[in-house]
């Protein structure tokens, strides 16, 4: 399924504050939603409700921790394939059915589907890419990480 760009009015000032603040971290406390919500002037329940809405409208695809698979003996790999436009959504569903797929994005390029694999072992990258190739009949191009970059995400408040 392709994601659509949200109109600016889809997010209010509170939504934008939530997105910006939670990029900075999340409290590791007995009641983290209460504590994160308080920093935003919300109750924990209101924060959860907002996060559920942001996910429902496609402003976020998930909410949860980001684990460094490589630091735990696993691996990450950026992958791409060239999916026929007429079959794009079906192929995306096959790719996304793999729990190792962390992100999947459509791009205007010959390699029009880009996704990240995160596996428990370095060998898992080749194994998962091979399963995706077998299921889709398409070549999965692998672009392993050479250097790590941290890109900050901010929305205009």
From Swiss-Prot:
Q: Which Pfam families does the protein's record reference? A: AsnC_trans_reg2, NirdL-like_HTH
Paired cysteines (S-S): none
What keywords tag this UniProt record?
Answer: Lyase
Q: Known InterPro entries for this protein?
A: AsnC_trans_reg2, HTH-Siroheme_Decarb, NirdL-like_HTH, WH-like_DNA-bd_sf
Q: Could you tell me which pathway this protein works in?
A: Porphyrin-containing compound metabolism
Lyase: is it a keyword of this entry?
yes
Q: What class of enzyme is it?
A: lyase
List the catalytic activities from the record. siroheme + 2 H(+) = 12,18-didecarboxysiroheme + 2 CO2
Q: What is its EC number?
A: 4.1.1.111
Q: Which GO terms describe its molecular function?
A: lyase activity
Signal sequence span is none
Q: How does it assemble?
A: Forms a complex composed of NirDL, NirG and NirH. All proteins are required for the total conversion of siroheme to didecarboxysiroheme.
Function according to Swiss-Prot or TrEMBL: Involved in heme d1 biosynthesis. Catalyzes the decarboxylation of siroheme into didecarboxysiroheme. Siroheme is probably decarboxylated to monodecarboxysiroheme, which is in turn decarboxylated to didecarboxysiroheme.
Q: Family, per the entry?
A: Belongs to the Ahb/Nir family.
| Record protein name field | Siroheme decarboxylase NirG subunit
What organism, scientifically named, is this protein from? Paracoccus pantotrophus (Thiosphaera pantotropha)
